[in-house]
């Protein structure tokens, strides 16, 4: 991986430079400059603090610089392209350069260095450039041929650990790049962050401000500055801005800033408090300011009488305010005020696309980086360095701080012991009367039976309380908590967040018990424990604070602190108590039996809460994902069984609008996890197991790094507290209900707990009873299986008497010699089976076998592969709603001599082989697909077949029977296409002219599809001007040829509905298969997630790009090979055929033919005169591992490295051209679907299916994601894969919450079936 932004120039502000002028050297010009003595030339060095404009190619470019060795007061503006200036070099990227070894001078080694790039070269440098080796202050000159790009960042980190100075600087470079990336993007996650803005006022160098809004469209920040109140908008590309960090903390084998994993519903899954960015080292000295006209910053620096040079760039003059940019609410400063702002960050030389890091720990000590535990891990790219001699403390970057009034409040009822006086609401009473809740409410323990009563817990909390004892007066407590928003016990059925606005409805205020002097007095007299109902910062200062509250309390501006307690990790979790002296202290934590009706009602199948589904849908969902749910429950039970009997399990109730995430791997926490009782640090089961296993074996835990506790103490696994989110035994109760309902409705169960004799869902005793259910007598579950070479675990289903025999004695149940079905053994078991209700086989011998529990194979040999918690639910399982023949086939498996299991034979593939027009046993021929004929399925749905009868194409997007036919192919993991949608859409809304008119002035990033280089400083109008006009396109610098561009992340993030409401409505009203694709679709499992939770962002998202028409362009992709965690429907809403390009049709036809398209597709283009937009290549999800192995093989052949935390598919670094596709088919037998997407076509891509896109003409595509019951298994696999990606991958964070989605989908399906039992006479 090369840490650079390609060949494009990033921003100049904050970068080091070298300048050479004729006035400072020999007279006579370039001829007198001797390259042999280039190091002796009179170079001047320094730092760029501001620029006149962002276009570095314009000859009027001026930069404000501070020269090394001079005071910052002597800063000045210089003309980069002046006549006297002979060279101007700026820091560009990180490379490896040869140098003599510091230890062994006669040895030449490769050393990381920052390379300078020539912005101006009139001195004849040519191939000579300057580099500065990390750890050195001086620059040297070397030939560019001696420089090598850095391919393996992780190996480099490990090699630098012995040199603390170099290691720290290397770490600081990465962090500063992350800072710069978010500042330049106008990232909304910076809201609430404190920043330093460079000032051109002679009296000060910097001034402080707080970010109150980020505008990704205009890439500007709206700030609140006390020193200059009129300053509202800042452009970090023009003036130096730094994010202020007050603290660094060392995390295991790397250093990271503290990360807040609580998610706000206000921005649908983005971090409420993202990782703080590091500030640069003490700024170098600088020089006097020359007065410059104010036209440079214009509206970008409102109210500032800028001291910067004028700009001749027409874009910088009189630019109207971009759409959706913050309102201009600042008045100009009075005359005489010359405060200004510029950034100071070191060069952003790094090319990792950063994900916004999150604020993590709050404390650090000197010397942490020198410890062995601080060595950099192979999978972690977020490395921070500790500045010398200081301990800086981070400020939280919170989304909610600028929206205090709209912060989501927890709509939760407080447990009974929370208030001394009894309180109840009508909603609580209504819920309590629900029959499903009666037995749960009867088991709710008394207030005296809690975690604090156990001696083990009290011993652990004593140290926490020793420093917190302080006499508390009621009035004092009341004043401290006066800003607390009251929580509501009323069940709120409204969404936490609507996409049409960024506001959330604040529930009616309810004050903390500590604000009521009478209640406080009663609590002091009785000594009764109560639940913390306010944030830590509003309680007594001496009590231990959680990580969020600790960071929040460090903010200098108290007005900007969060006033909502929901982001406190101890809110509605920790128990407090007044001792006999009236001192408030920590008493313990809630336990699973302390729930109330509202808390338990969120997790139980309550019939009155089920909307938007029907009986058939509920049966179908349960048949498809019921087994996955069972595996999930088994995994939770296994994890619970590993907890020592004497350990207490705490209960952390779900908080509305907050998503609990693992502080280590960013995975959404479903239920069981481990929490630090001192700071609230939380880790998932997988990370806990991995850490504990490594600690026991004495190995370094390098996969993920753990942040530190208060006072830099290490989080040891044995000191963490097991905690569950689902109250009581609700999880196991729902598991029992699932089996009961499936039995009553005849829904087949193929999960390991199908045989009830093993009682896998026997509910473990709650830990507050200090009892642990023994697991003796239970058969091994899927959690004991060891992964094979493939990350996908394949099930072995052996039924009947074979279940009791050793696995080695199992005989193949079907012949392997001449059967025409033997080819099915080569298929993976990942496909969901298709229903077969038409044929019922009478096989009494097999009837009992079908219902047996498939035993698990023993471990053939000790495995070194760590088996993770999630892997127990990654095993593909068959569809339960199937006929006897399918169950027979799924239950009949064979073992090879070496103990490996053959894949089950799948009924759907048998059908596929029987209905083909022609069959052949020749493996070299293309496999034919399943041709679903209306006469066979009983449907009358217009459709035809593409890709040699392997791709279903539905012709009527509004046909009510589409989803029935669609489902038959979708089950098998096949993509599907629907045509004719453009006839339903409002075409005027999707034309380029409408986008240009509405958004033309917005500033965006563009990507050159041929080079993947990022082009900054362009506008939306620049892109649309060349959309259908080749001569009017932006041209590259070298050949001055029109570039093939695509809009990068536009509209940004989740802004599609807000920016384009009419287009959103038009799309949602006409998108085909609304049962799957609409947000409220009955087969879209994401719709089952209650509004109580943070909803995942599933789009829509736009993809706008020019076409790649020339023969040379066939090796490039508009979107390289990648895969997505969710299903997607991609709609071609507009195809633009550009002017000024000859022989377009001939080249497009050749590209279609070269792309392996079939004859019918070519006929659509030639005879049907349809507009082809894009060429897709989609591969089956089951072939992902083969494709990954192939790409790694090719990269090794090309001399490229394969870092452990990177992936050739997830990196999106490959496009498979014809030669690579041919090799993939010949060497690995992998063939995909070559699909040409015409205007109005909708391509449905299954979750986990690798795919790539090559635009034939200029295209506007819109994609909507969804979660279908047929492909949930791929979501599991991908979520586990993404945990191991580097922190800079956009897919690293688990935003889908697949476990929560499955749980609530099953819960609602069960509720619907139970509600229908009485009407259908079910007992």
From Swiss-Prot:
Keyword annotations from UniProtKB, A to Z: Acetylation, Activator, Chromatin regulator, Cytoplasm, Differentiation, Dioxygenase, Iron, Metal-binding, Nucleus, Oxidoreductase, Phosphoprotein, Spermatogenesis, Transcription, Transcription regulation, Zinc, Zinc-finger
Description of what induces expression: By beta-adrenergic stimulation (at protein level).
Enzyme Commission (EC) number: 1.14.11.65
Pfam families recorded: DUF7030, JmjC, PWWP_KDM3B, Tudor_KDM3B
MF GO annotations: chromatin binding; histone H3K9 demethylase activity; histone H3K9me/H3K9me2 demethylase activity; iron ion binding; nuclear androgen receptor binding; transcription coregulator activity; zinc ion binding
Domain of life according to the entry: Eukaryota
GO annotation, biological process: androgen receptor signaling pathway; cellular response to leukemia inhibitory factor; formaldehyde biosynthetic process; positive regulation of cold-induced thermogenesis; positive regulation of transcription by RNA polymerase II; regulation of gene expression; regulation of stem cell differentiation; regulation of stem cell population maintenance
Cofactor annotation: Fe(2+)
Reactions performed catalytically: N(6),N(6)-dimethyl-L-lysyl(9)-[histone H3] + 2 2-oxoglutarate + 2 O2 = L-lysyl(9)-[histone H3] + 2 formaldehyde + 2 succinate + 2 CO2
Entry note: cofactor: Binds 1 Fe(2+) ion per subunit.
Family the UniProt entry places it in: Belongs to the JHDM2 histone demethylase family.
Function: Histone demethylase that specifically demethylates 'Lys-9' of histone H3, thereby playing a central role in histone code. Preferentially demethylates mono- and dimethylated H3 'Lys-9' residue, with a preference for dimethylated residue, while it has weak or no activity on trimethylated H3 'Lys-9'. Demethylation of Lys residue generates formaldehyde and succinate. Involved in hormone-dependent transcriptional activation, by participating in recruitment to androgen-receptor target genes, resulting in H3 'Lys-9' demethylation and transcriptional activation.
Protein name: Lysine-specific demethylase 3A
Organism: Mus musculus (Mouse)
